[in-house]
Structures are given as C-alpha cells and as structure tokens.
A protein has these predicted regions:
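Long, charged low-complexity segments
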Residues: 1-20, 26, 64-147
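Helix-loop segments that flank and shape redox-cofactor active sites
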Residues: 27-43
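Short N-terminal helix-initiation segments at or just after the protein's N-terminus
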Residues: 20-21, 58
C-alpha cells in the first residue's frame, strides 16, 4: 500500500490547521475577477464561502479541543450565519461588518448556487464580501491563536 500523498493532520493544535486551510482558500480568491463572460465568477464565491466556513469551524475545533461547549446543537454545514452565531456563543467576538454581509454569502453557500446552476434573485459582486471575509479571518485567528 502506498503512503498517502499528504500526511494526516496530527498537529497538537488542530484549530490552526483548519484556519490555515481557510487562508489557503481565501488566498486563491484574491485577484480573481468578479465577472467572467458576463456571469458572476462562481468559483470565487465558493472559495470565499468555504474560507469563511473553515475559519468559523476553526473556532469550533478550538472550543472542542479545550473542552468547551455552547448551548444548543451545532448548526448543519453551509449555514454560515448560524455557524457564526454558534461560534460567537463559544466566545468569538462578534463583528458588525461580518454580521452585515455574512447573511448574503451564507445564502449563496447554503443553496449551493456557486456550485450548481440555479436561479437566485439578486447576487452581489463577490468583491463586496472581501472586507468581511478578511475581518472574519482576523477575528477567528485572534480567537484561536496561542499566546
């Protein structure tokens, strides 16, 4: 049997692995155009939304590693707004910029519009979310980093 190309995640602080992966997705979205052939650049939306999901999940992994629990059940995948609220219940500092814009990106992510052709009323230009995504990555990093 061949060894895996990539070793399994065995870091003593797995939340850092989740956050590093979030940054990879965010970095790939940088510089991509918002519109391609007259259509929204759906891969850019996917990269941004997935970066957000992984960054939020880094907070959840951090809490789980520390033995913390939030009230209620963890929200399902792809509902970025609910995941963010859950992470805030675990101590992540709420950010008004993120709250204002996350609902729109969450809707696109939750309905898989960026992955599969579907009709969705109004779609915001992906670069409108850049500042909120960067703020979220900064906030989650501040929350999980080892001091």
């Amino acid at each position: 049997m061949k060894p895996p190309i990539f070793p399994p995640l065995t870091a003593p602080l797995p939340a850092l692995d989740w956050h590093a992966r979030a940054r990879m997705y965010r970095d790939q979205a940088l510089g991509m155009p918002d519109i391609v052939n007259g259509q929204p650049n759906w891969p850019r939306y996917f990269l941004l939304a997935h970066a957000v999901e992984l960054a939020i999940r880094s907070v959840l992994v951090h809490a789980k590693t520390a033995g913390e629990r939030a009230a209620g059940q963890e929200p399902g995948n792809h509902d970025l707004t609910a995941l963010y609220a859950y992470a805030c219940n675990l101590g992540l500092k709420s950010n008004l910029k993120v709250l204002d814009e996350l609902q729109y990106l969450s809707e696109i992510h939750k309905n898989h519009v960026a992955r599969y052709p579907k009709s969705l009323g109004q779609v915001w230009v992906a670069s409108e979310f850049d500042d909120a995504v960067d703020a979220l990555l900064s906030d989650t990093w501040q929350h999980i980093r080892v001091v």
